[in-house]
Amino acid sequence: MSSFSSEVQRRRTFAIISHPDAGKTTLTEKLLWFGGAIQVAGEVRGRKAARHATSDWMELEKQRGISVTSSVMQFPYREHMINLLDTPGHDDFSEDTYRTLTAVDSAVMVIDSVNGVEAQTIKLLNVCRMRDTPILTFINKLDRESRAPIELLDEIESTLGMQCAPMTWPIGMGKSFRGVYHLYNDTISFFDPHAEKGTAEIIQGLDNPRLDELIGAQADDLRVDVELVRGASNAFDKQAYLDGKQTPVFFGSAINNFGVQSLLDAVVELSPPPLPRNTASRVVEPTEEKFSGFVFKIQANMDPKHRDRIAFLRICSGRFERGMKIKQVATGKTLSVNNAITFMAQDRTTMDEAYSGDIIGIPNHGTVKLGDTFTEGENLKFIGIPSFAPEYFRRARIKNPMKMKQLQIGLKQLAEEGASQLFRPLLSNDLILGAIGLLQFDVVAHRLEHEYGVDVAFENYDCATARWLRGSDADLKAIADKYGFNVALDGNEEYVYLAPNRVNLQMAQERYPDIEFLETREIF
């Protein structure tokens, strides 16, 4: 195998998905710690302390203890290169998470052992399903009084429609939690919340007398449980996992470091290396020597001192080298990239080289757009995930009219990076924001104030849902003339129908049967 191919095969690019408060940020920190990327795992709960979670760098995140933005963290582990894409953990930030999930080859799903499968988990898993993304599952918080493990597996299977293959099995829970049994190598890891890595001792074999010495009567309970689990659960099938049909399940307690290393080992051993990617014209293989990639996130003003914008680009093929010239397919322009960066949350490092599966940051001043494809010359267009119709709408009202230009620039930039969607009705001067969740409006207001110097208020706007319009020029002109107050342009100058209620939407659809009213639109 060539050195280039071996570099590609070493890559593991994944994201963590979960419902808020299931422990995603804690798990992210502990994975970084086990991987040697950080010396001390930040205590996520200590919101008032000076130290905050490494992956939560925005001021609003520090105040609220949530992961609002997506960041990228790269670290070596067991002769592999891990690319961990942190995703917004709050349920109001799902669309940004959707886009991040287009850039990964696999995902880790975190389930709270107390609450089981929750709403946001279902939404995010459905996005992963669109690409049959392989999923590893980590059932967290076993140090608390939890639901029965078999009940949790049943719920995952019935609610998410995915086979579970337990890889480890817990010994007790809450105050009686003693560790886990590894079903595939017949070892037991004992839990100690005071041990540095959460593990007090590891022994071999269920029949080992040391097991009885350490946990007494729980040893016989474990032997019975394991016999039942082996008989009743699915055996691990790697191909089913890679096809997105089965999820290997691990149990642990991220806050206590327990079970995290087994999960990280599974990412290396089970998760796929960079996968082929679809474009509008052909499939791109990760081992092709020519560079290609797509932008899945734009982040403005990551560092207020720099006042810059960073385009996060997933490399799909080839090798990136500092100073190389790459083509922005949408414009035909060539960029000479001398200052591509990689991230450890807010820490920036200039990158000399990167390979398929890696994420690089390209500094720019608004010339790079969400979904842009870059190549060494070939006219490719990577296709991916749609933008989703917002569920909430607000009208922006500026408090100082002299700042209108700054408001327009700020809203445009924030919409381009995915913080919200921006709509401009044809027959008014209103600036309408659309979001998947209400907290996004708080984030936009906060960033407008602190990054653009604009004090803005958001008013309720009479809109129940939005639909992108697709049809002939004549039909689009006709609906715009008839429903001018409801038809708007989005940030890409595409027609959107803003329906005040479902009845109004239905009437418009019946009146214009040749126009498609779309809940999603392809942005890649």
Curated annotation (Swiss-Prot):
<dbReference type="InterPro" id="IPR005225">
    <property type="entry name" value="Small_GTP-bd"/>
</dbReference>
<dbReference type="InterPro" id="IPR041732">
    <property type="entry name" value="RF3_GTP-bd"/>
</dbReference>
<dbReference type="GO" id="GO:0016149">
    <property type="term" value="F:translation release factor activity, codon specific"/>
</dbReference>
<dbReference type="Pfam" id="PF00009">
    <property type="entry name" value="GTP_EFTU"/>
</dbReference>
<dbReference type="InterPro" id="IPR053905">
    <property type="entry name" value="EF-G-like_DII"/>
</dbReference>
<dbReference type="GO" id="GO:0006449">
    <property type="term" value="P:regulation of translational termination"/>
</dbReference>
<dbReference type="InterPro" id="IPR027417">
    <property type="entry name" value="P-loop_NTPase"/>
</dbReference>
<dbReference type="Pfam" id="PF16658">
    <property type="entry name" value="RF3_C"/>
</dbReference>
<comment type="similarity">
    <text>Belongs to the TRAFAC class translation factor GTPase superfamily. Classic translation factor GTPase family. PrfC subfamily.</text>
</comment>
<dbReference type="InterPro" id="IPR000795">
    <property type="entry name" value="T_Tr_GTP-bd_dom"/>
</dbReference>
<dbReference type="GO" id="GO:0005525">
    <property type="term" value="F:GTP binding"/>
</dbReference>
<feature type="binding site">
    <location>
        <begin position="86"/>
        <end position="90"/>
    </location>
    <ligand>
        <name>GTP</name>
    </ligand>
</feature>
<dbReference type="InterPro" id="IPR009000">
    <property type="entry name" value="Transl_B-barrel_sf"/>
</dbReference>
<dbReference type="GO" id="GO:0005829">
    <property type="term" value="C:cytosol"/>
</dbReference>
<feature type="binding site">
    <location>
        <begin position="140"/>
        <end position="143"/>
    </location>
    <ligand>
        <name>GTP</name>
    </ligand>
</feature>
<dbReference type="InterPro" id="IPR004548">
    <property type="entry name" value="PrfC"/>
</dbReference>
<keyword id="KW-0547">Nucleotide-binding</keyword>
<dbReference type="GO" id="GO:0016150">
    <property type="term" value="F:translation release factor activity, codon nonspecific"/>
</dbReference>
<keyword id="KW-0342">GTP-binding</keyword>
<feature type="domain" description="tr-type G">
    <location>
        <begin position="9"/>
        <end position="275"/>
    </location>
</feature>
<dbReference type="InterPro" id="IPR038467">
    <property type="entry name" value="RF3_dom_3_sf"/>
</dbReference>
<comment type="function">
    <text>Increases the formation of ribosomal termination complexes and stimulates activities of RF-1 and RF-2. It binds guanine nucleotides and has strong preference for UGA stop codons. It may interact directly with the ribosome. The stimulation of RF-1 and RF-2 is significantly reduced by GTP and GDP, but not by GMP.</text>
</comment>
<dbReference type="GO" id="GO:0003924">
    <property type="term" value="F:GTPase activity"/>
</dbReference>
<dbReference type="InterPro" id="IPR032090">
    <property type="entry name" value="RF3_C"/>
</dbReference>
<feature type="binding site">
    <location>
        <begin position="18"/>
        <end position="25"/>
    </location>
    <ligand>
        <name>GTP</name>
    </ligand>
</feature>
<dbReference type="Pfam" id="PF22042">
    <property type="entry name" value="EF-G_D2"/>
</dbReference>
<keyword id="KW-0963">Cytoplasm</keyword>
<protein>
    <recommendedName>
        <fullName>Peptide chain release factor 3</fullName>
    </recommendedName>
</protein>
<keyword id="KW-0648">Protein biosynthesis</keyword>
<dbReference type="InterPro" id="IPR035647">
    <property type="entry name" value="EFG_III/V"/>
</dbReference>
<dbReference type="InterPro" id="IPR031157">
    <property type="entry name" value="G_TR_CS"/>
</dbReference>
